[in-house]
A protein has these predicted regions:
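Polar-ligand-bearing catalytic/cofactor-coordination segments
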Residues: 1-146, 156, 160-221
């Protein structure tokens, strides 16, 4: 568990500048007027970025996306070309203001902290449960000790069940962050109408269910 902390932080730091460009075609956004408007919003949100990047995704998907990624000086503002092609300027600015809300609220650091804490207790519980199961049923399961490779299927079974069971907690935290980011965007761009039309367009392009059943919402949204 301790080993995952520096590794996760390292990849979060290098992801925007090294990992993401390996798999996608990044370039500076062509619409410089729009870029200046986005950077003006970024300045209000104290985001240390001086460029906006466009990613070519139209050949791969019809979905739209935009995000602010990275930590510290490696922070980047990114828009998919599908977003630029299918949303109006007001809608694009709302999307970016929403993503900047996550940055302003330091959600990436909160998410990392929450993930580390939850994973610590989950893995601790898994270790305790596996030891108990192996002590009582190790002969039947053909597992002599927890370190044995034969214990891997048992670990995968238990961990998948546990992480699924606690997923409503993760989605609840995510929904809370999304609501705060929405409110931040409304205050930043002062345009609620753009927010409504943006969500409708995103739901349509990303094939999201507008009103999922409550149980689905708890586990997936």
């Amino acid at each position: 568990w301790l080993v995952t902390i520096p590794i996760t932080l390292f990849f979060a730091y290098i992801q925007p500048v090294i990992i993401e460009p390996l798999f996608n075609d990044f370039s500076s956004i062509e619409n410089k007027e729009l870029e200046q408007k986005i950077l003006a919003l970024a300045e209000e949100a104290d985001i240390p970025a001086n460029r906006v990047y466009e990613v070519k995704m139209a050949d791969q998907t019809n979905a739209m996306n935009a995000y602010v990624s990275g930590i510290g000086k490696n922070t980047q503002i990114v828009l998919w070309d599908t977003t630029l092609a299918n949303l109006s300027e007001e809608e694009i600015l709302f999307v970016m203001a929403h993503e900047m809300g996550h940055y302003a609220h330091k959600d990436i650091y909160k998410d990392l902290t929450i993930d580390f804490v939850i994973s610590f207790f989950v893995y601790w519980f898994i270790a305790k449960l596996m030891k108990n199961i192996i002590q009582k049923n190790g002969q039947v399961l053909n597992i002599k000790r927890i370190e044995a490779i034969h214990s891997l299927p048992l670990y995968l079974l238990i961990s998948s069940i546990l992480f699924f069971a606690i997923s409503p907690l993760s989605t609840a935290i995510s929904r809370h962050q999304e609501i705060k980011a929405d409110n931040y965007a409304i205050e930043l761009v002062e345009e609620e109408g753009a927010g409504i039309s943006t969500f409708q367009a995103l739901a349509k392009s990303n094939l999201n269910e507008a009103n999922p059943p409550l149980i689905v919402k708890w586990f997936r949204y």
